[in-house]
């Protein structure tokens, strides 16, 4: 089993929660191809301005993959600025494990996370990625903060 940090925004988090589907652009096909049924996915929402309020980067849920990767270009996700008409066609069905009552703010975790080797420029470990594999140790650490 592998553990993944899935990077999204507020709008697409609503879609994930409602439809139990994760999708990535074609350019991330090599990454999503490594995901197997039963893997655990942590949903990470990037810092963004929502209705005039800056919401910090945070982890909002954990899911288990319930399918292999499949292709579907139907427009269910909202294409973020700068991504044109992206439909996130490479998708995986999800099964919710836990949607956190209180999101876990990400920045306080940075000093403790093994996968973030450059603690000062930590966003470089996530920037431009749709998802990235993380060590089981980091997954467990994050879940400790969810209680």
Swiss-Prot record:
Pfam families: EVE (PF01878). It comes from the Archaea. InterPro entries: EVE_domain, PUA-like_sf, UPF0310. Gene3D superfamilies: ph1033 like domains (3.10.590.10). HAMAP family: UPF0310. Belongs to the UPF0310 family. PANTHER family: UPF0310 PROTEIN MJECL36. This is UPF0310 protein AF_2356.
